[in-house]
């Protein structure tokens, strides 16, 4: 499952990226992009109630602290509110929401007010093209600029610091990074949904390894639309494998360690998993756009329950989410980005 590290690449990879795809069939690339978009968004005919009586019998005790809706359009430079936001990064006490449909990043305060808008209006070099994931290393923001096959590194004020082309030489399509995680070593990982791979790079943008076969697969061989990524304290990577309905665990060197989850709409099953986050206790949180819930698993993959009711104490209450996608955990709080223009902040139970 692991491809040997590539050596001798230019750190930024931009020249290689320009040469890499001269023979790509444009129509084929567009078709693949459409398939990926459909798998990632899954926003058509979304349920307002959680399916499966078995699922509703397992409620994880997280409490809603804040619900932030789209800022008023009249306070934004473009005059448009959120358009399918996809992810969030928490940097200190600062919240950065990736507003994918508008190709911009919004910094919000804790009440949802817009503090700054990061896009080409703020810096002409900040050209986002359908970016789907954002993360932080504690100092900088990292953005998976999906439509440009690259990862951008930005200051919290939006100034571009680095730009890394991503992808494996010889793959049939340009990379489409839709998941992103940053290690405490300075390495970063991306999921390439176009070529069914997970890629790890060092801080200079050199490819360290590539996991996956380069085609749709399952089991230990590979992925079928890899998406959200998270790292545990040991440096193991957790990969959301959307169309296989599972989460795959990889060692720091890319070796396959195991998986959990299965396709379905009952307890512990995953219908359209999107993103993953891990708390300090090692519990794994997986957003599911079709179940309109966040499923929770223990460090040993034991199913612990779901988050998704307006009132966790009332199993008959309505659904909290419509299309949960991007996740982040900071301290004892879980941040959930809903594609229907909302951010939810939840207090997690004390797991010490």
Q: Where in this protein do the model-derived segments appear?
A:
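Eukaryotic scaffold repeat domains enriched in small/polar residues
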Residues: 2-352
């Amino acid at each position: 499952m692991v491809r040997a590290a590539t050596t001798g690449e230019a750190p930024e990879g931009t020249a290689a990226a320009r040469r890499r795809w001269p023979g790509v069939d444009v129509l084929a690339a567009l078709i693949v992009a459409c398939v990926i978009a459909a798998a990632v968004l899954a926003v058509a005919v979304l349920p307002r109630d959680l399916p499966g009586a078995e699922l509703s019998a397992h409620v994880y005790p997280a409490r809603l602290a804040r619900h932030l809706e789209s800022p008023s359009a009249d306070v934004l430079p473009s005059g448009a509110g959120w358009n399918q936001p996809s992810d969030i990064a928490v940097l200190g006490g600062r919240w950065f929401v990736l507003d994918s449909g508008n190709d911009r990043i919004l910094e919000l305060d804790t009440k949802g007010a817009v503090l700054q808008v990061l896009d080409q209006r703020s810096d002409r070099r900040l050209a986002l093209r359908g970016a789907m994931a954002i993360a932080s290393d504690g100092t900088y923001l990292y953005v998976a600029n999906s439509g440009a096959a690259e990862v951008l590194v930005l200051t919290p004020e939006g100034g571009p610091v680095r730009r890394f082309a991503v992808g494996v030489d010889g793959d049939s399509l340009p990379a489409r990074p839709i998941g992103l995680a940053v290690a405490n070593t300075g390495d970063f990982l991306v999921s390439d949904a176009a070529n069914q791979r997970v890629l790890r790079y060092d801080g200079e943008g050199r490819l360290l390894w590539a996991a996956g076969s380069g085609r749709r697969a399952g089991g230990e061989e590979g992925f079928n639309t890899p998406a959200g990524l998270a790292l545990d304290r040991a440096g193991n990577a957790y990969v959301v494998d959307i169309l296989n309905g599972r989460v795959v665990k990889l060692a720091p060197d890319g070796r396959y360690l195991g998986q959990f989850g299965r396709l379905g709409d009952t307890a512990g099953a995953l219908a359209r998993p999107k993103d993953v986050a891990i708390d300090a206790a090692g519990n794994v949180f997986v957003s599911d756009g079709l179940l309109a819930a966040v499923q929770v698993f223990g460090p040993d993959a034991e199913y612990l329950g779901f988050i998704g009711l307006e009132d966790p104490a009332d199993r008959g209450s309505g659904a909290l989410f419509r299309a949960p996608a991007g996740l982040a955990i900071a301290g004892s709080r879980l941040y959930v980005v809903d594609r229907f223009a909302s951010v939810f902040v939840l207090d997690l139970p004390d797991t010490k």
